[in-house]
Amino acid sequence: MFQRARSSRLPLKLSRQGRRYSSHYARTPEPAPPEIAHLIATYAQHLPRPLTLGTLLATGRPLTAESVQTSVSYAQAEIPRRLATRIRSLEGLPFIVGTNPYIARTLNGFRKSFLWSATYPAVKNLEENAAFATQLETLVQDHANDIPTMAKG
């Protein structure tokens, strides 16, 4: 690391070895705000309820206001749980993976969607269900490219 100058009268000089690394590319992922982190922790404690084929068939026929209400209640309970699980998984990745901009973008999208789904008011009638379904379609479109985006990183 230190080299003697050719003349013994000159001081030691420091030679650089290795590469220079910049923190420009590897930014620390933004932590979730405390209120969101607490909400995520609350939902992540509960395991997702499985959805069986029998349940799907029983819920869909005949289509009544009650079956629609049952379906939307299930969706409102499960979407935040499953998003919280995914968020926890992404937050648990090693630091170097979490600094990847594609992973960080997906994580932020999951957090935004989680906050929306966890704080959405309970659906009580068919009109509210239509509005919820429209918002849910937008949410699905927002996450349509998550897997290809994460594959880039």
Regions found by a protein language model. Give the residues of each.
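N-terminal mitochondrial targeting presequence
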Residues: 1-47
